Every structure is written in C-alpha cells, then in structure tokens.
Amino acid sequence: MAKGGAKQRTKKKKAAPEKAAIHIHSTFNNTIVTLTDTEGRPIIWSSGGNVGFKGAKKGTPFSAQMASDKVAKEALNLGVKRVDVYVKGPGSGRESAIRALQAAGLNVESIKDVTPIPHNGCRPKKKRF
C-alpha cells in the first residue's frame, strides 16, 4: 500500500547573475537557445519544438524568434540584464534569434560566432542533388 504522507518536491528556480551568456545552436532542422551563467552552467533553455512547432517548422526563423523570446523573458524575470551571445551552426534562425533577444530588452554586449570549422579533418558527405 502507498503511504499517504509523501511530499512532492518542487524544483527551485536558480538565482541568475546580472550578467550571463546565451548560446544559440542553429541547425537546418531546429534552433536551441540556452541561457547559462558565466561559467557555462545552464539556467534556462528553449527550442523550436519546445515552443510548439513540429517537423520542418522547427527550423524556421520564426520558431527561433519565439524560442529566443521565451528565454529572454525568463531571463529578465530572473534579473539578468547583460548577456554575451554565442552563435553556433549554419541554420536560418541565427539572425532572428539575436534580434528577438535585443527586442525583448536584454543588453547584448557581444556576439561571437563559435561555429566549429574543420582544418581538413573528416571527409565530408557526398553532395546531394
């Protein structure tokens, strides 16, 4: 028999610093936006699928804008004012995600492209026609 006095644990909201980093990982299929502290520990995240888009619609600039807007609003509620933005990947949601962060009221101090570029590493896939 189950005990009646079991307590449910509620997840505590992490106290965010005034300055944080936002990582935007943009692929052709989706865009993932993550708010981290300055050491890189994640605080909040969102993606195209997380805000309600399915399938090919997750890779659109509009879904990236919605995901960024959600993260920016949560960040402002936690007290984050200044952010550094790190963008990775070739997807279509890069620019619209950055614009959404600025429009939401966050002070974007720097934007860095951290897309990994091979120095002639692995052989790429064959071309698709």
Swiss-Prot record:
Q: Where is this region: Disordered?
A: 1-20
> A GO biological process this protein is involved in?
translation
A GO molecular function term, named singly, is:
structural constituent of ribosome
Tell me the subunit arrangement.
Part of the 30S ribosomal subunit. Interacts with proteins S7 and S18. Binds to IF-3.
Write out the biased-composition intervals (Basic residues).
Answer: 1-14
Describe the function of this protein.
Located on the platform of the 30S subunit, it bridges several disparate RNA helices of the 16S rRNA. Forms part of the Shine-Dalgarno cleft in the 70S ribosome.
Please name the SUPFAM superfamilies in this protein's record.
Translational machinery components
Q: Which InterPro entries match?
A: Ribosomal_uS11 (IPR001971), Ribosomal_uS11_bac-type (IPR019981), Ribosomal_uS11_CS (IPR018102), Ribosomal_uS11_sf (IPR036967)
Could you tell me which cysteines form disulfide bridges?
Answer: none
User: Which Pfam family, any one, appears in the UniProt record?
Assistant: Ribosomal_S11
Q: Which protein is depicted?
A: Small ribosomal subunit protein uS11
Q: Which domain of life is it from?
A: Bacteria
Q: Which GO terms describe its cellular component?
A: ribonucleoprotein complex; ribosome
Q: Which family does it belong to?
A: Belongs to the universal ribosomal protein uS11 family.
